[in-house]
Regions:
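Active-site-proximal helices and loops of the catalytic beta/alpha 8
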Residues: 4, 59-197
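Glycan-binding loop/region signatures in secreted carbohydrate-active enzymes
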Residues: 1-55, 126, 130-150, 197
């Protein structure tokens, strides 16, 4: 864990071994445990079912709201457990979104926008609906298909009334590209770099 955590959150740093998971595997889609407790990019995985960890996250979101932020994007959202994940389940999404949204509404009278990045699928046969009851989610496969078809001169086939994830349009976030579009074997566009586009 970074020494910056020690500087800015000394209490969290002292308890870092309690607040990070002991599971040593890398994140992958083979099992619920591997999806929600595996290490993403070799980073330690927070114990997001711990109420103290949730409290730190809620406080950070409130600080951001106080600075004028009106929405949040959770990177790698599929790697945070849902209420439907059996023995790995938690109330993280309910607690985080309810607390942040309530705080934002009290301050502004408006609704807070929150979405999470779910690349390719939720992994381990998990459902998007476990997330969409609290947040909107990305559908990179639809965006990748549009990009693929347009760059091959097939713009007419780029339009499709159906999202590849099966998520309702009101819950889906699409993009033309992201930092993951060209990322090694996890890149889903079929391009190795932007020069091909």
């Amino acid at each position: 864990m970074s020494n910056q955590v020690k500087k800015y959150e000394p209490e969290f740093y002292k308890k870092r071994k309690t607040y990070t998971r002991t599971y040593k595997g890398d994140a992958n889609d083979s099992s619920v445990q591997a999806v929600v407790q595996g290490h993403v990019s070799k980073c330690p995985d927070l114990v997001t079912n711990d109420t103290a960890v949730q409290g730190y996250i809620i406080n950070l979101l409130k600080e951001c709201i106080d600075c004028g932020v009106d929405g949040f994007r959770f990177d790698a959202a599929k790697h945070i457990e849902t209420e439907d994940d059996g023995e790995y389940a938690s109330d993280y999404w309910k607690n985080i979104t309810t607390s942040a949204s309530s705080y934002y509404t009290q301050k502004t009278g408006d609704d807070l926008y929150i979405y999470g990045e779910i690349l390719n699928n939720c992994g381990a046969d998990r459902s998007y609906s476990s997330y969409t009851k609290y947040i909107n989610v990305t559908d990179n496969r639809t965006g990748d298909a549009v990009l693929y078809n347009v760059t091959r001169g097939k713009a007419s086939t780029a339009t499709n009334a159906k999202y590849k994830s099966g998520v309702a349009a009101s819950n889906a976030v699409l993009w033309a590209e992201s930092h993951d579009t060209y990322e090694g074997s996890s890149g889903s566009s079929g391009f190795s770099n932007t020069a091909d586009v």
